[in-house]
Amino acid sequence: MNVTSKPGELVPESDVAAIMRGTHGDPFRVLGMHGGGGAPLSVRVFAPQAAEVAVLGQGGEVLAPLERIGAEGFFAGTVPGEEKFPYRLRFVSGPHEWEADDPYRFPEVLGELDEYLLGEGRHYQLYTRLGAHPAEIEGVQGVSFAVWAPNARRVSVVGAFNAWDGRRHPMRKRIGVGVWELFVPGLHTGDLYKYELLGPSGERLPLKSDPLSFAQEAPPATASVVHGLPEAEWHDAGWMQERESRQRRDAPISIYEVHAGSWRQGLDYDALAEELSAYVREMGFTHVEFLPISEHPFTGSWGYQPIGLFAPTARFGPPEGFARLVDRLHRDGIGVILDWVPAHFPSDAHGLANFDGTHLYDHADPRQGFHRDWNTQIYNFGRQEVANFLQASALFWLDRYHVDALRVDAVASMLYLDYSRNAGEWVPNRHGGRENLEAIDFLRGVNERVRLDHPGCITIAEESTAFPQVSRPVEDGGLGFGFKWNMGWMHDTLGYFRRDPIHRKHHQNDLTFGMVYAYSEDFVLPLSHDEVVHGKGSLIGQMAGDRWQKFANLRAYFGFMWAHPGKKLLFMGGEFAQEREWNHDASLDWHLLDDPSHAGMKRLVADLNREYRKRPALHRMDCDPEGFEWIDAGDSENSVLSFLRKAPGEKPVLAVCNLTPVVRSDYRIGVPEGGEWREILNSDAAIYGGSDVGNPGGLQAEEFSWHGRPASLRLTLPPLATIFVTPA
């Protein structure tokens, strides 16, 4: 049966019914202007909010009223003319009258190249096409929407502009790539929206946020916000030119890890730009690493269960605010590292889980697709569209926000199919092994794209296993990361400093074993947020001994860490010996700096950063075995160890650690050259809160062979302390 609204105008009743029910999968076949080329022109509109609809010409004149068909607001009618033309619509509802452009008169949003790249899984700037983009099409301002949902029966964009009615703005499906698109005239930056989808069986799914939204409502609200691609006003050209040299293996890299919400509570991005940047400059760190900034619904996840992989969290202001934060850090000579989470995603109803009514982003088999430790879904890295989505997210932060590095979270969980699973709870790879071959290929692909598209940017792996060549080039069989966190070093050394000094002589290996594998990867030494949560206590709280010994131990530990090969990372609060375990709902205890012991710790960390940056011997050969030499690793009876840090053509630095609360006088240590030496740093100095035992003034190396070296120094070793000594 056909419904006739005007002579020559036929609208299949089934199409009218499907549009009014909101189940039609091809709205452009029904709505908009049809005919031309000899056939009568007709216009069909679904407007349940209107009592009358008329078609207007380009000059605003009424060309034809449309006839209402049925009670649900479907209008149709013929209009004069032989070929299709731009038109507008006038709506009347009671005393209200308004005009608007018809979304269904506009052409396709995606081009042929977009379709090709999407089909290939190589649209690395996916964010320039999918998502919500303010645009002008045929002289009309509006917003272009596009979302991947290949298994959905119908997708609509909804918001206050259509009373969240999914029947009113159904989208066009690009069959070949499974992307739904629609240009909606009259929408603006700041408008809220979501997608309403019908699943494969026609079931209405929970409203979904846009996977490629550039802004989200502040949680607990969950709508996406229309926002164009970030277009910040950048002033960081100097940093960008120098960035590559500041992030090489031979550069000093000292990272301050920050949770933006609890460093100092109540700060937005702009306040952080002022206060955090000034503080990091004062402390001498080279980089700030932010716990995940991408939008996440649950604050207690610290950002590690993100949903908005292209949206800075709205908790601290708009996206432009985050750009200004990065810009300010760069202008102050500080690099920016973001924690990035491609391993898994939360199952919140408005997110990626069951996005189009299927396991679109994850695996249907829970042995592959569900992470029991975190109650999250695991991405299907073998699906090229999913890999492309994640790759585009990584590149987005580097491209649009000038981020310098990505610290990739939970890499170990990606690399192994049996990660945290018992026998029978995982599916072997095609060779029968436990390695996740698709994830390995994905990580290599991301790292290669970063290297090719953003030279000078780096990636850093949080990887806790012995998986080989994590930080080696892809062409050499590696994963292609720039650096890897040295979790083994952290575990061993932190365990050592938890021990009572009386027992340490039996555990010297905890401090020395790290050098056995120190150059198997390019390492970062991490004292991260993970070490000060879940009942572990603060760093200072984990140190052995009474209050004085705890502070002395932590100062000695920091001295050992800054002297040890590897880049440095310290979580906020550790630098001044925060005493409470970290709480994401509270600020750091800045009032502790009124206590000389805490203020002294802060000064020590600043001085360690200064020495580390100033002295090539301490950083240039961090990743080269030629930059390290044991003097004596074997004096376990006294819990003393000594080693040299070196760089070609530079003065060496001798580090000596005395890790019992006993002063050791006239302690002889072999050195590579005679002449005058001097103590340049002493963690026991009074300015750091120590007992001020040490080696003031100059030190004369004696021509007395010791430890296999031609000369030696007689030192006073302060209790529970690390000292640095160098030729004068």
Curated annotation (Swiss-Prot):
One Pfam family, short name: Alpha-amylase
Active-site residue numbers: 409, 462
Transmembrane spans: none
GO MF annotations in UniProt: 1,4-alpha-glucan branching enzyme activity; cation binding; hydrolase activity, hydrolyzing O-glycosyl compounds
Known role: Catalyzes the formation of the alpha-1,6-glucosidic linkages in glycogen by scission of a 1,4-alpha-linked oligosaccharide from growing alpha-1,4-glucan chains and the subsequent attachment of the oligosaccharide to the alpha-1,6 position.
SUBUNIT field: Monomer.
Name the UniProt record assigns to this protein: 1,4-alpha-glucan branching enzyme GlgB
Source species: Cereibacter sphaeroides (strain ATCC 17023 / DSM 158 / JCM 6121 / CCUG 31486 / LMG 2827 / NBRC 12203 / NCIMB 8253 / ATH 2.4.1.) (Rhodobacter sphaeroides)
